[in-house]
């Protein structure tokens, strides 16, 4: 296989994705250059040393990427695949590179032009899977603990072929969780919070961290897209907004509506677990607000959105996360902070913060 990695991203955010992989690679003393084509929905990063591409996808924790939806090692671009046999050249690229991979994904970038190739990708998957199994490149059954084979079509008859590691990649096809919009939700923004739960919270921890009966606050709540997700998980919610909340949410008896400015509201309860916030405001102002809640011990976990400026978007996010981390540490607070541009996000990123309490002698564990 070659010295390149491919990263999927949102169309229009290729430069941010390129800046991110270049910076993270340099931190590992791996050097190369990014190839960027605007609005293509992907970035290629070419390493100067042959073995470095595999090192990158092993050693950079995937969850630390903000703008990348998927990462994989790829070979040279396969061009002009013969219509009578597209399978053999793809198989040839993988012979001796990978054995007994657990899954095959034939994918495209998330752009309108590329989506026209999806039907073809589905048709190719069956014969290709069969041929890869015959060559022992793919295991006889799907295995979530083995590497994933990616065939990434960028145009008809043109694809990159490569692999990712299942313990350090996105588990989703094309890096996109498939979520269905609930017809009774007050707004489409509800999908942002649902996706955030899938991305930031391991499935085996949902029962503990998204538990029935928890208390939550939604700042800038109306009409209730994010509150809806909390209601669905049987939480009790303080919804803060000067606007109107959807009557369907108020009728559940789980929502208390406070007509107030989300930036000025202060909670009266001491047992709030979740804080969520999707307000249209400058990123710095929102970051400072959430930091204040965490410093004051008003919540345990928070999910919030940062609306991005037109320029220097990557720098803006990094600066805000660093500012939050610094202020929390100054106040003696340990926290896990991760950000992701979700599929359902637009010119924004979603941030998740979780306070971590270290067990001190004689001190009650505040997590429970």
From Swiss-Prot:
Record GO biological process: methylation; rRNA processing
Reactions the enzyme catalyzes: cytidine(2498) in 23S rRNA + S-adenosyl-L-methionine = 2'-O-methylcytidine(2498) in 23S rRNA + S-adenosyl-L-homocysteine + H(+)
EC number: 2.1.1.186
Entry keywords, A to Z: Cytoplasm, Methyltransferase, rRNA processing, S-adenosyl-L-methionine, Transferase
Active site per database record: 307
Enzyme class: transferase
Molecular function GO terms recorded: S-adenosylmethionine-dependent methyltransferase activity
Domain of life from the UniProt record: Bacteria
GO cellular component annotations of the record: cytoplasm
Subcellular localization: Cytoplasm
Entry-linked Gene3D superfamilies: 3.30.2300.20, 3.30.70.2810, Vaccinia Virus protein VP39
Stored Pfam families: FtsJ (PF01728), RlmM_FDX (PF18125), RLMM_N (PF21239)
List of residues binding S-adenosyl-L-methionine: 189, 222-225, 241, 261, 278
Subunit relationships: Monomer.
Family: Belongs to the class I-like SAM-binding methyltransferase superfamily. RNA methyltransferase RlmE family. RlmM subfamily.
Its job: Catalyzes the 2'-O-methylation at nucleotide C2498 in 23S rRNA.
UniProt xrefs under HAMAP family: 23SrRNA_methyltr_M
The protein's name in its UniProt record: Ribosomal RNA large subunit methyltransferase M
Gene: rlmM
